[in-house]
């Protein structure tokens, strides 16, 4: 049973951003020398550019198509925000007894001396994401929200304490601010 005759979501395009829609499914967003591509494909959901807007719509959608339209619109808004402003995650290094040494080598974050361990722990940095370590702060920046968030999560998970009481062993690297929201 269709939800409505047509469901349509419109996204305004800022002046500094150019958007191209290829074959009603691939979205290419460019701004300030940065570019992001994303394939957003689902049956009966159409993405097109009209004047100064990107339109995501479906004729006679079911519940699933109606939900996907909102999801695709959010993805496009995040891509526009990413190429125009970028995303930044702020993390704090916390330790009680063993001071950690954090360094960035290639596409990995190396965490030395975590809880006094002899072998370093490693976290993967996703493509197109930059990690900067300064004192007790770790800043993760990038234009792709998903890759930036995944890199921050990789760093946080690399310092997860296993087999010990987490109320006592609070050492680790924790996300304190993500995409402008203080946690």
Curated annotation (Swiss-Prot):
It comes from the Archaea. Keywords: Ribonucleoprotein, Ribosomal protein, RNA-binding, rRNA-binding. The keyword Nucleotide-binding does not apply. GO terms for molecular function: rRNA binding; structural constituent of ribosome. PROSITE patterns: RIBOSOMAL_L6_2 (PS00700). One of its GO terms (biological process) is cytoplasmic translation. Pfam families: Ribosomal_L6. InterPro entries: Ribosomal_uL6-like, Ribosomal_uL6-like_a/b-dom_sf, Ribosomal_uL6_a/b-dom, Ribosomal_uL6_arc, Ribosomal_uL6_CS2. The keyword Calcium does not apply. Coiled coil: none annotated. One of its GO terms (cellular component) is cytosolic large ribosomal subunit. Belongs to the universal ribosomal protein uL6 family. This protein binds to the 23S rRNA, and is important in its secondary structure. It is located near the subunit interface in the base of the L7/L12 stalk, and near the tRNA binding site of the peptidyltransferase center. Part of the 50S ribosomal subunit. This is Large ribosomal subunit protein uL6. It comes from Methanococcus aeolicus (strain ATCC BAA-1280 / DSM 17508 / OCM 812 / Nankai-3). The lineage of its organism: Archaea, Methanobacteriati, Methanobacteriota, Methanomada group, Methanococci.
């Amino acid at each position: 049973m269709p939800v409505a005759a047509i469901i349509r979501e419109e996204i305004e395009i800022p002046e500094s951003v150019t958007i191209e829609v290829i074959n009603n499914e691939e979205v290419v967003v460019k701004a300030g020398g940065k570019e992001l591509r994303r394939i957003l494909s689902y049956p009966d959901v159409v993405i097109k550019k009209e004047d100064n807007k990107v339109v995501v719509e479906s004729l006679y959608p079911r519940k699933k198509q109606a939900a996907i339209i909102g999801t695709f619109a959010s993805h496009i808004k995040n891509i526009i925000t990413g190429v125009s402003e970028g995303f930044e995650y702020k993390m704090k290094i916390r330790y009680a007894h063993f001071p950690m040494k954090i360094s960035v080598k290639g596409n990995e974050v190396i965490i030395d001396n975590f809880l006094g361990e002899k072998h370093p722990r490693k976290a993967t940095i996703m493509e197109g994401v930059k990690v900067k370590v300064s004192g007790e702060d770790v800043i993760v920046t990038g234009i792709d929200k998903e890759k930036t968030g995944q890199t921050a999560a990789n760093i946080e998970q690399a310092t997860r304490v296993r087999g010990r009481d987490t109320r006592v062993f609070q050492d680790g690297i924790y996300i304190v601010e993500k995409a402008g929201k203080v946690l």
